[in-house]
Structure formats: C-alpha cells, structure tokens
Amino acid sequence: MIINTSTKLITILLSILLVISVVPTIVHSQSNYKPPHDKPGPAIDILRFRAFHVDIAPQEILANQMDMYYFGLKVAAAKDIRDSPGIKVHEAPTSTISLLLNPAPGPEGQLNPFSIKEVRQAVQLIINRDFVVQEIYQGMAVPMLTQVSSYDHDYLTLYDMILESSINYDPDYAKFIINEAMTNAGAELIEGKWNYEGKPIRIDFIIRVEDERRDVGDLIRSEVENLGFIVQPTYQQFGPAIYTVYSSDPNLVGTGGSWHMYTEGWGKGAADRYDSGTLNQMCSPWLGTMPGWQELGFWQYENEELDLLGQRIFSGNFQNEEERNSIYVDASKLCLDESVRIWIANIITNLPADDSIEGISLDIIAGPKSLWTQRDAYIPGKNDLTIGNVWVWTERTTWNPVGGFGDVYGNDIWRNMYDPPITRHPFTGLPIPYRANYDVTTSGPNGNIELPSDSFMWNSETSSWSNVPVGSTATSKVVFDYSKYFASKWHHGEQINMADVIYSIYQTFDLTYNEDKSLMEFAIATVSKPYLDSFKGFRIVDDNTLEVYVDFWHFAPDYIADYASITSITMPWEILYSMDTLVFDQRKAAYSDTAAQRFNVPWISLVMDRDARLVRNVIREHNSANNIPDNVFNVQGLQLVSDSDATSRYDSVLSWFDEYGMLVISNGPFMLYRYEPPAQYAELHAFRDENYPFKPGQFFFGEADLVDILDVDSNIIEIGSDNEITVTLTGFGRASAEVGAVMIVGGNINHFTRVMTTA
C-alpha cells in the first residue's frame, strides 16, 4: 500500500543500511566452554520449568527461585534489574506484536468496517509506532510494517518497498479515508459515531494483558474511538484470547463473544536467512493462519494472488535469488496493501539469567531461547536448572505432534525433548544438519531427475505403498542418513528404526489424501496438500538411509534438504498409530482444536491424564489383539515390523504410562518426568542412553561476533556526481557487510552504491 500523506518529504535524506552476515569464530567460542562431564546427553541432570508472573519475576530470580526467565521482562523492570549482582540480562529480538483485523462481512444487516480494505488501510495510519517503540517500550523495540523487521535477514530484500510505502502516523488522513469508505458502504456518522441501518457500529477488541500489549491495545482503542467507532475492549490472557480468535468462525463478527480486532504476539524460533514460512504464515490464506483458518464451514479470507506468490516462495518456484527476492517483494507489498494483519513492533526481549550459567548459545533472533542453550547450560557445582516462564500450561497448551504444539509455552519445554533432523544455524540462519546427515542432488531449477523403478509413494485408495509410474521425475533428490537416530533409543527404551520414519510419512499422506480422514481433520489436510503434492517418491536404500524425491529447488542447497525432510521423527510409531486409531477409527478425540470443537471430542494432549489414558487404552487393545498396520510396514516386500517387535513396543509404552502417567515419548537429551498443569510445573530428566549421539559442547556456539557501526562520515551529497561515504566498523572474527546507500529526494529513491566490506 502506497499512501500519499499530507506531509511531503522535501528534504534530502541519506540512509545507510548495513546488513551483516556473520561468519562466527566458533573455535574461539568453544574454547571458552568446559563441559561438566563427557556423558551422553545434556550438561545437567534435571531441568525444571515453573510459572512466575512477569511482575514478580525480577524478585524471584534475585531470590534464586529460578535461574533464567523465558518471558520478556517489562522494560522498566529490566532496567532496574540490569545492574543487580549475579544477574545478566540477555537481549534478543525474539518477540513481535501485530494487530489482527477481522475482514469477514458479518451477519446480514450488519457492517463490519474491517471488511472494507480502505478502512483496514486507514488503520495503518492510526498506529503510532514511534510512540509504541519510544514510550511504551522505552526504546527497547523497533517499528515494523511487514512480517520482517530490521533484525531479520530479509529486511534488506524489502527495504526499498518499505520506504516507498510512505506509511506514517497520520490520524487526520486516516479519518478522511474512513469517512469516504464508510459513507460509500452506507454508514452514517451521527453525533460523531458511525451507524449502520440505524444502529451504532460497535468494535469488539480483544486485548492481551500479560505484557505491554495492554498499553498498546489501549492506545489503539483510543485512536479507533477517535475515528467515530464505539469500541468494546475485552482484556484477556493467552488461553481465552486464543480460543476466541483462532477457534471461531470470523463471520460471527458482531455477535456475542466474537471479535473485530486482536493484539497478537509472536515468538521467533530462530534466525532464517531466506524466509518462506513467515511470509506465508502471516500473509497467505492457504497456510491456515489467516482468518477462517482453513476450517470447514468457516468463512474464509481469500486472496488467490497472495496464495500464488506465497506458494512460489514456499515451493522454490523461481529461477535464481533475484527472482526469489522479486516474488518476496511482490507478496509482501500485496500483504501490506491488504492490511489484514498490521505489524506494530519487534520487541527487544529482556531475558534475565544467573550470570554464573555456563554454556549459553545466543541465537541472533531467539537469544538464549534457542534449541542449543539447555543442552549445554549448567551452573558449576550444580546438576539442575530452573527456567521460569509466565505459563507452563494454558488452556491452549496441547501436546500432540500432529495438530498441537501451537503455543510458545509448551514449545519452550518440548524443544528440549526431541532432536530435529535439520535445524538453523544460530548466526547465519541457514539450515544445517543436526541428527540426520544429508546429501543433495538437484537438476533445478529447470531440469529433472528420473526416479528409480523401486521408488514408492503412499496410495490412499489402495491403502498401500505403490511403485511410482515408470518415467517419473523430480527436480531434486535428498539422501537422508538417519544412523544417529537409529543407533540410539526412544525414551522408553525401544530402538529407533526405519519403521518410525515410514509410519510418520504414511500418517501425513493418509491424513491428507484419505477422503474420510481429510474431512475429519479438514484444516490440517487442506494446509498440508500443496506441500505434499511436491513429493514424487521415496526409496529405502538400506537400514539407515532414505532417498526423497521432490519438485523443489533452491539456490542454497541446504534449503532443499530442509524442505525434503518430511518427518521430524518426534514420537515412536506405536504412539502415532494408537492416536490415529483413537481419532479416525474410534472418533473419541481430535488432532486439531477446530475438529475437536466440531465433533465435540477432546483435543488430544498426551500430557493430560484423560487423553493419555484414552491412548493407553487403545495400545492395550492393539497389544491384546496383536494389531500391526501391516499395510504400512510392508514396503516393497520388506516387512519393517514383526509381531515380537510390536509386542515389545506396546509393552514399553504401557510400562512408561504406569510409571509417569503421560505418553510423551521422544528421543532428545531430556525426557519428561513430571507435568503438573494445576501447579504450573514441569520437570525434565536427562536421557543418558549410552548410544545417544551428542555430549555437552558438541553444538556450543556461544555468541555471534557481530560487527557494530562506529561512525558514518560523509560530505554533502552532490546529485549527479561521484560521492564517497566512509563507514567505520568494529568487531571480532570475520564478517561480510553489504552497505546500500539510498538517497531519497522528494519521495523518489535512487541507488548510488552497493559495496562489500570486511571488518
């Protein structure tokens, strides 16, 4: 959206944009880390999670009630505690806030102002981002207009577009746009308030209360009221707010218990050099995170062009980096123009920790909340750590690997319990192998690789694996070596093997392509299909190795491997099989929240006693009947699971439940020992299998050796002449910096230099 505001830019502004791609000196960082032992698994034996309200968190960490706090302190509290002895406050741009507008038309006879695009665009102009950043967050934030901020790698990709948008705080111009749009829609302004068909228009505004979003929400409420709307604020915490917004039909807008606006908050998981997920998540309806949520029977926000552009980025449908960036710009520009999700700020989150903790690796986005920290962290002389958070459990916390793990609080615990095949480098944001090694072969973007004749795909019509048609081709092949998984065991003591990989692949495909299953879990199936359509075949090479063939290409080959990694190998096949039986055969539970609501069954969560018992009962039935999904485990004449294998698996799960009362079983450095929702408490114990592949320090990164700008020295810029700008940088290690000098004259943008420097 490009809006010409009443204030014209008439001065010459020189803007230096410095985006730094760091090559960290990992050897130097590792030399500063001394593992407390050389045993397999994490550095400590016990990892606890406790809930502390954000307002009392500073006192509690000073009183040694916790060692690290995972929820960002309020800015004033962070400043007060920063100089306290024994405390180090880690800063990380890990949180973003946005305003979600409901674009549904609403019931007949009512007018939802946000169903009008011009009204949504006008809301951009009443968001005083500078006030939010400087006053509410006291400088500990940066303003945002798009799904990426100045801390993200792709900000450089969008920099010109953001400048061209000319979006600034301009409530007078916003009111002008609103007056015209609302009048054209048939509304009347009566005594300063908008009415439609003789009734005042009321805006239902869900405002979160746990942090500064309450203040941000009140600021926005006041601005919307100044536009002539009656605003009814509802102040809610995480669980009720999420349920109201993301589990309801947007077209109920204007009825009791619905919503027009919501103050969203997001946690960034890791750095990402070339974004595809965030763009699609925040802009493109096909992925199921725009109003309507792709749930059957709900009104859906639709935008075919955004879906097309987003899927091109997601599926690697471009010829080179330049075209990829062009598509990314076009999609982001259209998303900004639609203004369904309005970005406000990227928060510099203040995360306090005991300064004696060793082994903290700081992701440049997630800070200490990354995959790495709790695997290496310890306090000398202690064998445990306590992590505080604002919640351990909420009404929306759901532990199932198919349609759960949607909240940040559950994920803060869960990420310590499983090992992903591939993850992101904490500094560069590029995919790197973690527990699976891989080899990429590609003929992309325009060539093809012919699939071997013994490659196979799941056939939902015959409920079996079928050979791919003769002459089948794919753009890329990725060979995955899972030996680091298969040499070790699941937490319940059973060996991880190819059956776990194959069942997970089957489960994903059958949920999507089996008509009965896809109707039950409609939202999951609809979102999954565009991704799964790009897979052309699989081939088991040997006991440890799987070939995956996909129609996907990327100029950075590691992204091809990341895309082709269809299974995360997070839970054993017998758990997945029993959940499938419970959900699709017995219909006593559901994987997703919307399906659970539609069929009036539990949204399955394996940490909850009721749900875990339901799954336990199914496992008992499978065990007594000696049930095995033979059609799944018979692959090209290879039988992956025997009767004795299945019996051993079932027995181990039942023993696990008897001991722990839960059914969260995974493969990472920690296993779940206790989980107590009423007490807001979770306890993880170290997993010390002798063949677990990692020991403390193997993936210790420390801090990135970032480059800082010390000075920008330039004379008066002469248009049409060669000009020299001297940028003084400082920093350790090796770094590359791309400096773009942009001159803006009367709103026109002209590029002068784009150079590479080192420091």
Q: Model-found features: residue ranges?
A:
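Extracytoplasmic/peripheral linker and loop segments enriched in polar/acidic and small residues
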Residues: 121, 125, 133-136, 167, ...
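Structural transition elements
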Residues: 143-188, 207-215, 319, 670, ...
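Periplasmic binding protein-like
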Residues: 58-62, 66-78, 84, 226-289, ...
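Surface-exposed, Gly/Pro/Thr- and Asp/Glu-enriched linker/hinge segments
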Residues: 29-45, 77, 83, 113, ...
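Extracellular/periplasmic solute-recognition and catalytic clefts
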Residues: 32-36, 48-107, 265-269, 275-281, ...
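Long beta-strand-rich cores associated with HINT superfamily self-processing modules
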Residues: 278, 282-283, 290, 351-396, ...
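Aromatic- and charge-enriched surface segment that lines or borders ligand/interaction sites
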Residues: 50, 58-64, 110-122, 450-517
